[in-house]
């Protein structure tokens, strides 16, 4: 889920990176409290689903500007939670959109695309995510099984 402002200090004490940066305001708050370089992933809601977090694709440029202007944040890549659909073409289209955003930002910043990770895909759709360029997948269900009610 999203990182709440009142949890930033706790998060900074126990994480090596933040994968849920979704606004310039949050970037500013994290930067003000960080004491060293902190890799961050911009979370983008490419599915457009109201139940998903992340900035809109149209807001990515402003968020990248905030990260670039910060003293402590280092852009490590992009993250999304996939479309909740059994239709491969739809899920892959959303992942392809995030890859396209990453590629545009890499070109704008003058870095290699491979310098910016893509964190996308979970146990149910990891093959589709990898096919679309994922470099990080989240495999909780595959490792630990279904959540208990």
Describe each region flagged by the PLM.
Residues 1-126, 130-132, 144-146:
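Conserved alpha/beta-domain cores
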Residues 133-135, 140:
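Active-site-proximal glycine-rich helix-loop-beta segment
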Residues 139, 145-149:
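Short C-terminal tail/terminal secondary-structure segment
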